[in-house]
Structure formats: C-alpha cells, structure tokens
Amino acid sequence: MSPQTETKASVGFKAGVKDYKLNYYTPEYKPQDTDILAAFRVTPQPGVPSEEAGAAVAAESSTGTWTTVWTDGLTSLDRYKGRCYHIDPVAGEDNQYICYVAYPLDLFEEGSVTNMFTSIVGNVFGFKALRALRLEDLRIPIAYIKTFQGPPHGIQVERDKLNKYGRPLLGCTIKPKLGLSAKNYGRAVYECLRGGLDFTKDDENVNSQPFMRWRDRLLFCAEALYKAQAETGEIKGHYLNATAGTCEEMIKRAVFARELGAPIVMHDYLTGGFTANTTLAHYCRDNGLLLHIHRAMHALIDRQKNHGMHFRVLAKALRLSGGDHIHAGTVVGKLEGERDITLGFVDLLRDDHTEIDDARGIYFTQSWVSTPGVLPVASGGIHVWHMPALTEIFGDDSVLQFGGGTLGHPWGNAPGRVANRVALEACVQARNEGRDLASEGNVIIREASKWSPELAAACEVWKEIKFEFPAVDVFHKGKKKN
C-alpha cells in the first residue's frame, strides 16, 4: 500500500465498543427550554445497570450506535446527542426505572410527527439490552409546537360552526359496523339524527368494501343529513370516514364530502399513519371541514404497562398532527381507562397549559400556546345510566358517543336517540342547578324517565349492564418533577 493510500487512525479515534454511559449518561445536564424531553419506563436485562440502560436509550434514539465510528469526528456529538439526565426507580416494581432523556431540537424535522417518532420510538424498542421499554410522556417545546398547524379548527370554532353551546355533543356509531347496504346505512343515519343526535359516525372499519362503496355511502348519508336538519332545525353531521389505502384516495373522499356540503370527515390516524393524518388535517383547515379522529390500533401500542407507548403521548402527537375530535375512552364503559389517568390526557387535549400531576400521570409541564384544543370523544359500551357520570367526568367540551346504547333501544333508532338526548338534557339542567351528578345521578335519570317513555324503556333494558374490571393502566409514583 502506498503512503498516499494508507489508512491511518486519526488522532483521538480508537475503534471498539464503549459503554453508552460514558457519553450519554449526563446527570449534571440541565434540560434546555428547546429540548424535547422524554420519560421512558426502562426494564433492563439482568446484569445491565440502570445508568447503562438509560444511556443506551438516549444513544440509540439519537446519534449513537453499537460501536465507535470514525465519522463521529466529523460532527459535534455534544450538540446533537440525546442525554439521559435523571433516573428514578419505579415504586413497587423490581428492576424498573423511569429514565429521563433530553433531545436537542435540531434532531427533528419541523412539522413532522413521523420524523419525531421515527427517532424517539424507533429501533431502540427492539434493543436486546432491554427487557422492555415504554415511552410514558413527552415534553414538546414551544419552539417545535409552532412548526405544526395542529387541529384544523378547534373547540370554539366547532361550536360556532354548529351553533351549539353549554352541553356535551351527542354522537352515535352506526351498527352493525359492517354489512349494511348504503341505502340502509343512510336510513339508520337519518333515524338517529332526527331523534336528537348532533352526529352519527362511520365505524372505523368502514372504508369502501364490496357491500358498500364509499361514494354510495356518502350520497345516502348526505341525503339523511339534510333531511334531518330540515326537520329538526339543528345543524347535523356524519363522520364520513376518508381513511383509504393511499393519501391520494383519502383526499379524493374528503373532496367529495366537501362538495356534498358535509361539515365533518373522519380518519383512523394510527392505521392511516401520521403523514396521511397531517395531510388530511391541512386539507380540512383549508376547506372548512371538521376532522374526527379514531384511534384504532392504539391498544396494541399503549395497553401493556411495561412496553410500548402511553396514550398520553399519542394524544399529544394527535394535537400536533391535527384533529378536532379524538376517542379517549369512557372510564365507565367497556374499554380500558382509569379515571385519573384518562382525565390527565383529556386535559392535555383540551387545555392551553398543563402542570406536572402525579395523580394523573403527567410527567412534564406542557404549554400549547395558540394550538387549538381537541374534543375528547367518550365511546364504547355506554348507555343512559352512564350519562350522569359521563357529564360529570368529561364536562361540556366533549362528545358522548353511544352506538349500541342507541341502536339497541327496544323501540328503534330514533327512540334510542330521544332517550339519550333527554338523559343528557336532564343531567345538564341538574348540574346547572347545583345538584351533584356523582351522588344523585340515578335519581336524576329516574326523574327524567317519568316524562319520557323512550328514556324509561332504555333504563329498563340496560339497568343491569356494567363493565367492572380493574384498570391495567395505573400510575406508579416515585418520579422526578421536571
């Protein structure tokens, strides 16, 4: 080999493998206002120290790899690397730790949830040195938030569009979720909307199947929408699911909904993907459409308490990517959701500012500046007896969505909707009069049922229905405040 082509190790470079903690565990580091902060629940493999595990997470989700590389010398790793700056043991758990990691903002593309997640929850989740890894929370800095459009419209603009104030909005998912023809589907929509609903909804499974193509469904739903509006004098909506196999097809469906004069469309944001969701959110703002978001696939990601990603992170990501509604559990229905934890991410969706809150599982103070809020949707196994609890838990700025709790009424769809509307109005009136919905809820519903045979029939059908199972997602104290 000639002297000109001989490869020599540069000064300061030594090949080999180094412990991650030598470069990526920095307990002396003070997080910057512009850093993205992450709280990971880390379960190391036996024999792996917590400092090495936390540093490995910081390294593998930022600039690090398994061995030293000579190109490290071509950049400033101190500027770009993630840093594990604090570790707390998880109370009540063996060999589990909350590891806090700070990421410099320059690691992430502006306005891209896709890029943010590709780094923070990418390959590191398959790292062999870890038995399990869960992202519990993120602190998104204001500087990064301002690169996103966020929700197309937000809570106040939606209320102004609908001219509905002072109460939760009411919705219903059309059932059976699959198998109806477009005409029969439209008939069910009409019966629900004329009975007192604000919205009806495509099920998340409904896209464009052989039994009901999307264009036919939209046409019959639009007919039902306008007929119900003419009869009731109220503005109505149907969540037309625009989710499709390609972004181009998704936008085509949203365009058709706008041409029909529909006020709202829908997207399955996790199965559809964040790039598609952000694209649709931008279209909706530009064209005056509200955007309803379903979270199908979330439990695959967030239900296991030791591995995956907590829904509060997915909720923050949705507020960045864009959506005016998102399903958020019910606390009292058939789906997983402990009360305080649920209210924690409901606050993250609606409020301009949230503080650290142990009881609600919020690890970081989060400011949303001018980003519009998102309406939480309570849906899944709820009926009229749940109405007082739902009104008390979620408050006015929410959507209470009954599927089987409407269409399962013994007298049909329209009476089912009447029952729910009467129950809601009774709860709102009682609350405004100063009554305690938590303790007097059943009394309030029984009193209202004396004046509504539809509500009385619903009360009889669902009087024994309960979903009482312990929540998997509970908060373990023993964390550092940031």
Swiss-Prot record:
Biological process according to GO: photorespiration; reductive pentose-phosphate cycle
Propeptide feature: residues: 1-2
Places the protein is found: Plastid, Chloroplast
UniProt xrefs under Pfam families: RuBisCO_large, RuBisCO_large_N
Keyword Chloroplast listed: yes
The enzyme's E.C. designation: 4.1.1.39
InterPro entries: RuBisCO, RuBisCo_large_chain_AS, RuBisCO_lsu_C, RuBisCO_lsu_C_sf, RuBisCO_lsu_fd_N, RuBisCO_lsu_N_sf, RuBisCO_lsuI
Gene Ontology MF, one: monooxygenase activity
Gene Ontology CC terms: chloroplast
Keyword line: Acetylation, Calvin cycle, Carbon dioxide fixation, Chloroplast, Disulfide bond, Lyase, Magnesium, Metal-binding, Methylation, Monooxygenase, Oxidoreductase, Photorespiration, Photosynthesis, Plastid
PROSITE patterns associated with the record: RUBISCO_LARGE
Alphabetized NCBIfam families for the sequence: PRK04208.1 (NF003252)
Name of the protein described by the UniProt record: Ribulose bisphosphate carboxylase large chain
UniProt source species: Phytolacca americana (American pokeweed)
Species lineage: Eukaryota, Viridiplantae, Streptophyta, Embryophyta, Tracheophyta
